[in-house]
Amino acid sequence: MKQYLDLLDRVLTEGIEKGDRTGTGTISVFGHQMRFNLDEGFPCLTTKKLHLKSIIYELLWFLKGDTNVKYLQDHGVRIWNEWADETGDLGHIYGYQWRSWPTYDGGFIDQISEAVDAIKHNPDSRRIIVSAWNVGDLDHMNLPPCHAFFQFYVANGRLSLQLYQRSADIFLGVPFNIASYALLLQMMAQVTGLQAGDFIHTLGDAHIYLNHLEQVKLQLSREPRPLPQMKINPDVKNIFDFQFKDFELVNYDPHPHIAGKVAV
């Protein structure tokens, strides 16, 4: 994935050292975009091994509208534990906003269902957007959304998705985000009868934490390998019916995992 390695190299070369909320310190650039054509393979990083199980279960968790870590923990996924309260809840984060965005009159909007409907029945719309950045609800989130909103685009029988990510932890978070939204694009394309097109990833504050610099340099020393393919159960026609068993990543041959501490 040259696009990702180019981002790492750019931040190492051009990045400005800044403080941050966690006290760890970063080097960062502001504004970067990567494009992944899913015809060329599934964009799962090969210069270090990713924990695909966590990526899939997290996405299914979002789509369920769930905001409690119990579902994740029941499936051996612990990536949200640091931000959960004593009951396991995370407040009104991604799943809540995607599926139950509150309206002024006491109702709720299921943004995912509305996006599916728009792709099917109004594909030329420029309003097929799902947002997790609810300004009026930020104080009710244990962690405000880093990947803030995404938009769908339909052309020539292909569905593309562009994500805006306000805050991008390049070493740990961004590889997960790329794979997660590429998978969401494939799922949405399948249930709307389209081919998966491009995933475009637009970053705001793109940063490397100072305690990840050596890991990043190690990753840049590794030669990328061919991308794998993601196979999805073709019988699933409803976006909310997918289960973990419906996904198979084939021909994934990554370099070994590189550990890094999460900045909380």
Swiss-Prot record:
Binding residue positions for dUMP: 21, 126-127, 166-169, 177, 207-209
Entry's Gene Ontology BP terms: dTMP biosynthetic process; dTTP biosynthetic process; methylation
Reaction it catalyzes: dUMP + (6R)-5,10-methylene-5,6,7,8-tetrahydrofolate = 7,8-dihydrofolate + dTMP
Chain positions recorded as (6R)-5,10-methylene-5,6,7,8-tetrahydrofolate binding sites: 51, 169, 263
EC number: 2.1.1.45
Disulphide linkage map: none
InterPro entries: Thymidate_synth/dCMP_Mease, Thymidate_synth/dCMP_Mease_dom, Thymidate_synth/dCMP_Mease_sf, Thymidylate_synthase, Thymidylate_synthase_AS
Pathway: Pyrimidine metabolism; dTTP biosynthesis
UniProt-recorded Gene Ontology molecular function terms: thymidylate synthase activity
Annotated catalytic residues: 146
GO (cellular component) term, any one: cytosol
Subcellular location: Cytoplasm
Pfam family, one: Thymidylat_synt
PROSITE patterns per record: THYMIDYLATE_SYNTHASE
Swiss-Prot/TrEMBL keywords: Cytoplasm, Methyltransferase, Nucleotide biosynthesis, Transferase
Annotated function: Catalyzes the reductive methylation of 2'-deoxyuridine-5'-monophosphate (dUMP) to 2'-deoxythymidine-5'-monophosphate (dTMP) while utilizing 5,10-methylenetetrahydrofolate (mTHF) as the methyl donor and reductant in the reaction, yielding dihydrofolate (DHF) as a by-product. This enzymatic reaction provides an intracellular de novo source of dTMP, an essential precursor for DNA biosynthesis.
PANTHER family documented for this protein: THYMIDYLATE SYNTHASE, THYMIDYLATE SYNTHASE 1
Family: Belongs to the thymidylate synthase family. Bacterial-type ThyA subfamily.
Subunit structure: Homodimer.
Name listed for the protein in its UniProt record: Thymidylate synthase
Organism: Bacteroides fragilis (strain YCH46)
